[in-house]
């Protein structure tokens, strides 16, 4: 007998994201976050970089997780959501971010881009496929994408001090699989659960 998938859709807005969850989303307190049931969740988040930590918490609330799995997934999701928002939706290049950080103008540039058209209306779409033994997250931004094959190898001694690619490396080391689509604006991670 096949087990049906539960589907829940969550959309963030300018208000508190936690208040937008539908009542049928399994909650820790209710004891309904059973790992034996497959679950598909879809989310649409506004490009609000300062709320990435809160978004990660929302994404991980669906299931009770082993603490190490939660830590590793949290790290991967944080890095990939930041990339999707900053470099994807806001189209801020790695070089522009590095320069802004060095000059102390990063917060200003981020605020300006976040309120300018067409960037301010862009969203990050996340789909989570939970099964009893693994989870897959697909993160899609509305930017132009990037050539993920051209990321410098952050483990190469010549690149150790570069900022570019470090978040992707951290994410890759935290999950079992990380793949991009051809355009580079959709990334999928897979993590086997303990």
Walk through the language-model features, giving the residues of each.
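Conserved polar catalytic motif of the HATPase_c/GHKL fold
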Residues: 79, 83
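Alpha-helix N-cap/helix-start and coil->helix boundary motif
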Residues: 77-78, 186
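Bergerat-fold GHKL ATPase/HATPase_c domain
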Residues: 2-75, 86, 90-114, 127-129
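Conserved beta-strand-loop-beta-strand hairpin that lines the nucleotide-binding pocket
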Residues: 27-40, 85-194
């Amino acid at each position: 007998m096949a087990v049906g998938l539960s589907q829940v859709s969550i959309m963030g807005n300018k208000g508190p994201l936690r208040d937008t969850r539908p009542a049928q989303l399994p909650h820790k307190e209710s004891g309904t976050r059973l790992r034996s049931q497959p679950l598909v969740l879809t989310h649409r988040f506004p490009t609000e970089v300062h709320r990435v930590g809160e978004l990660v918490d929302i994404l991980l609330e669906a299931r009770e997780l082993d603490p190490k799995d939660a830590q590793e997934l949290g790290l991967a999701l944080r890095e990939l959501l930041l990339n999707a928002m900053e470099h994807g939706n806001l189209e801020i290049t790695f070089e522009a971010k590095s320069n802004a950080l060095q000059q102390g103008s990063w917060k200003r540039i981020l605020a300006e881009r976040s309120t300018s058209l067409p960037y301010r209306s862009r969203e990050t779409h996340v789909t989570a496929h939970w099964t009893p033994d693994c989870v897959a997250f697909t993160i899609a931004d509305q930017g132009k994408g990037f050539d993920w094959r051209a990321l410098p190898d952050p483990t190469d001694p010549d690149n150790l001090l570069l900022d570019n690619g470090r978040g992707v490396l951290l994410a890759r080391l935290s999950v079992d699989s990380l793949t991009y689509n051809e355009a580079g604006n959709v990334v999928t991670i897979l993590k086997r659960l303990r």
